[in-house]
């Protein structure tokens, strides 16, 4: 009898264990909250392959790390995307302290969201942002071969590899002669042995790595890369880019037709906060008398032909990060000014030199390359010197003739500063029989206004029609579901910098009504936007003027009723549901009741 009871007890324990194991398996594999990222791609080495509709890969928490398994052969599947290839806004959601550290260190070292970059992996689809006419264009079969030169210093490993793989994935093999990576004496460990190992195991022999023994800066680093190149055309890219469909052929065709033509792609925008790839408007390069590059609208005369917005057009200057140039012409024209340091001003110098010395500079709308636009440069010069001022002085004294006084009118403190020996560059200008800077202003950039007693005022060339307001998707009260309290201004909703708190709802009070628009902004009483500090995630959210740039004012309602802030990767939380003060803060997203919000119509 006792033996039978013992057997029943054992069978019961076994049955219970199996039942719980099955339930836990179902929970952790299929519940939305346990997955955390229903739309997160798993990092891998294979190119993008869309999954069947409504089937998504599970999120691998290993991919939260810096790049813990880049060579272990994850399956490489990506999320099933919409037609515009937007990423899930929750890709940057923070679930634990490790996530928080990766994000914070990433912004500190790289000035963009490293957490998302690592989760994104090395391959992804990007939206085809070209004009519809571009897809119908054909190009000669005998285009010149390209050497892609990518100089990097302390770049994020995942961003660098995504740049390289985007080139390999979207460039015809017969046009890609080589990719030359120039490591400008980086200090990060993963850019040493890890990069060597990854290249050896996963990359084509066309990808070559050159390491500088000391910090040279972008300018001289590119010259090092060009000296190692053997392709017909040099294509310079920054180390945090992603090339688009058919990006190279439109750049090579004008160079084949005229080797003295220098071409630039349209630079699309990759958000530093979300890494979402979006189309950039068709604009051209200019500059101001402070010798800073700026974007200008394109005169209609440049786009009046039958090809419209798909036709290449002249640009007075280039942004400098991305361009293509015949290799022999690059050397004949004097490469870069090696007396310039690190970064800054070299793009204007080479732009002036191209135009003044017999070449032409075009922007090609059918070539699109995405670029992470950071809000600051995460590194400086080795000695803390003002390299922009040093380089601008060399540029002004070599190329601008009497118009350098326009620069000194804005920077009088630099008039007597040393800028090094420029005799070699002046000799180059004489040898190339270059035109005057006045010729450049008269013929290439007549819109540039000159100040001084004899200057004539000019009417504005371009009209600014203003920004279109984002479409409102929903209006209502923002209610914390645990307490049924409404999120309102602590003071008046027009007070910039004011806090928000959870208070009793008053359905007769219009100042409690939020608007949620297509830019993912939350606007209280049609006045100010809910905003978070991008650098201090411990600060509470505040009401600030709407800036329309996403990031700190971009909020997403998750499927589990969490309100996720894209820029900081955290969720809005009611600090103490029992307190009448109603303070709110940002916290690691855990799906708890205090993090559940509802925008009630």
From Swiss-Prot:
Positions of glycan attachment: 29, 202, 508
GO biological-process terms attached to the record: cilium assembly; determination of left/right symmetry; Notch receptor processing; Notch signaling involved in heart development; protein O-linked glycosylation via threonine; regulation of Notch signaling pathway
EC id: 2.4.1.41
Mode of membrane association: Single-pass type II membrane protein
Disruption of the gene: reported phenotype: Aberrant left-right patterning resulting in abnormal cardiac loops, including leftward and symmetric/midline loops.
InterPro entries linked to this entry: GalNAc-T, Glyco_trans_2-like, Nucleotide-diphossugar_trans, Ricin_B-like_lectins, Ricin_B_lectin
Annotated segments matching region Catalytic subdomain A: 143-254
Lumenal compartment residues: 29-601
Residue intervals on the Cytoplasmic side: 1-7
Pfam families: Glycos_transf_2 (PF00535), Ricin_B_lectin (PF00652)
The protein's required cofactors: Mn(2+); Ca(2+)
GO CC term (a single one): Golgi membrane
Key words, A-Z: Calcium, Disulfide bond, Glycoprotein, Glycosyltransferase, Golgi apparatus, Lectin, Manganese, Membrane, Notch signaling pathway, Signal-anchor, Transferase, Transmembrane, Transmembrane helix
Gene3D superfamilies cross-referenced by the UniProt entry: 2.80.10.50, Spore Coat Polysaccharide Biosynthesis Protein SpsA, Chain A
Localization in the cell: Golgi apparatus membrane
Catalyzed reactions per annotation: L-seryl-[protein] + UDP-N-acetyl-alpha-D-galactosamine = a 3-O-[N-acetyl-alpha-D-galactosaminyl]-L-seryl-[protein] + UDP + H(+); L-threonyl-[protein] + UDP-N-acetyl-alpha-D-galactosamine = a 3-O-[N-acetyl-alpha-D-galactosaminyl]-L-threonyl-[protein] + UDP + H(+)
Pathway linked to the protein: Protein modification; protein glycosylation
Sequence segments annotated as region (Catalytic subdomain B): 312-374
Disulfide bond sites: 486-505, 529-546, 571-589
GO-annotated molecular function: carbohydrate binding; Notch binding; polypeptide N-acetylgalactosaminyltransferase activity
Domain spans labelled Ricin B-type lectin: 469-600
Major localization listed first in the record, in broad terms: Golgi
Recorded domain comment: There are two conserved domains in the glycosyltransferase region: the N-terminal domain (domain A, also called GT1 motif), which is probably involved in manganese coordination and substrate binding and the C-terminal domain (domain B, also called Gal/GalNAc-T motif), which is probably involved in catalytic reaction and UDP-Gal binding. The ricin B-type lectin domain binds to GalNAc and contributes to the glycopeptide specificity.
Family (UniProt): Belongs to the glycosyltransferase 2 family. GalNAc-T subfamily.
Subunit-structure text: Interacts with notch1.
Name of protein: Polypeptide N-acetylgalactosaminyltransferase 11
Lineage, top ranks: Eukaryota, Metazoa, Chordata, Craniata, Vertebrata
């Amino acid at each position: 009898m006792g033996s039978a009871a013992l057997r029943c007890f054992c069978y019961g324990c076994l049955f219970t264990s199996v039942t719980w194991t099955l339930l836990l398996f179902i929970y952790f594999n299929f519940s939305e909250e346990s997955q955390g990222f229903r739309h997160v791609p798993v990092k891998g080495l294979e190119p993008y392959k869309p999954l069947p509709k409504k089937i998504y890969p599970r999120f691998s928490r290993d991919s939260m790390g810096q790049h813990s398994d880049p060579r272990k052969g994850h399956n490489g599947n990506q999320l099933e995307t919409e037609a515009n290839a937007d990423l899930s806004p929750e890709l940057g959601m923070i679930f634990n302290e490790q996530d928080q550290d990766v994000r914070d260190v990433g912004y500190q070292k790289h000035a963009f969201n490293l957490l998302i970059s690592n989760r994104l992996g090395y391959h992804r689809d990007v939206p085809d942002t070209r004009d519809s006419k571009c897809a119908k264009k054909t190009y000669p079969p005998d285009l010149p071969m390209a050497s892609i030169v990518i100089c990097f210093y302390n770049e994020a490993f995942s961003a660098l590899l995504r740049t390289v793989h985007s080139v390999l994935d979207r460039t015809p093999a017969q046009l890609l002669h080589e990719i030359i990576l120039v490591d400008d004496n980086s200090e990060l460990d993963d850019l040493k042995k890890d990069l060597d190992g990854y290249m050896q195991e996963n990359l084509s022999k066309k990808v070559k790595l050159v390491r500088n023994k000391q910090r040279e800066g972008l300018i001289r680093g590119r010259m090092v890369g060009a000296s190692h190149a053997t392709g017909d055309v040099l294509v310079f890219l920054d180390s945090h880019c992603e090339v688009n469909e058919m990006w190279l052929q439109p750049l090579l065709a004008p160079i084949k037709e005229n080797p003295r033509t220098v071409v630039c792609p349209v630079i699309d925008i990759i958000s530093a906060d979300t890494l979402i790839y979006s189309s950039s408007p068709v604009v051209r390069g200019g500059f101001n008398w402070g010798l800073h590059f700026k974007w200008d609208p394109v005169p209609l005369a440049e786009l009046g032909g039958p090809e419209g917005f798909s036709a290449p057009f002249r640009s007075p200057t280039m942004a400098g990060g991305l361009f293509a140039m015949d290799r022999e012409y690059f050397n004949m024209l004097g490469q870069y000014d090696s007396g310039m340091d690190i970064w800054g001003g070299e793009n204007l110098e080479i732009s002036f030199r191209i135009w003044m010395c017999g070449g032409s500079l075009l922007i090609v709308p059918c070539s699109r390359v995405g670029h992470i636009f950071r809000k600051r440069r995460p590194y400086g010069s080795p000695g803390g010197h003002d390299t922009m001022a040093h380089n601008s002085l060399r540029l002004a004294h070599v190329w601008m003739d009497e118009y350098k006084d326009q620069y000194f009118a804005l920077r009088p403190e630099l008039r007597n500063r040393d800028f090094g020996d420029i005799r070699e560059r002046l000799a180059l200008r004489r040898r190339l029989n270059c035109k005057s800077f006045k010729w450049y202003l008269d013929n290439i950039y007549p819109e540039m206004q000159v100040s001084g007693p004899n200057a004539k005022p000019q009417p504005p060339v371009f009209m600014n029609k203003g920004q279109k307001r984002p479409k409102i998707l929903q209006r209502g009260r923002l209610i914390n579901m645990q307490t049924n309290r409404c999120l309102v201004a602590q003071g008046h909703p027009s007070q910039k910098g004011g806090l928000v708190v959870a208070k009793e709802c008053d359905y007769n009070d219009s100042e409690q009504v939020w608007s949620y628009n297509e830019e993912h902004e939350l606007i209280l009483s049609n006045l100010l936007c809910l905003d978070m500090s991008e650098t201090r995630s411990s600060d509470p959210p505040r009401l600030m003027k709407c800036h329309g740039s996403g990031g700190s004012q971009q909020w997403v309602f998750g499927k589990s009723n969490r309100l996720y802030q894209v820029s900081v990767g955290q969720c809005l939380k009611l600090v103490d549901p029992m307190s009448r003060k109603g303070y709110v803060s940002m916290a690691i997203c855990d799906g708890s009741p205090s993090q559940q919000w509802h925008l009630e119509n």
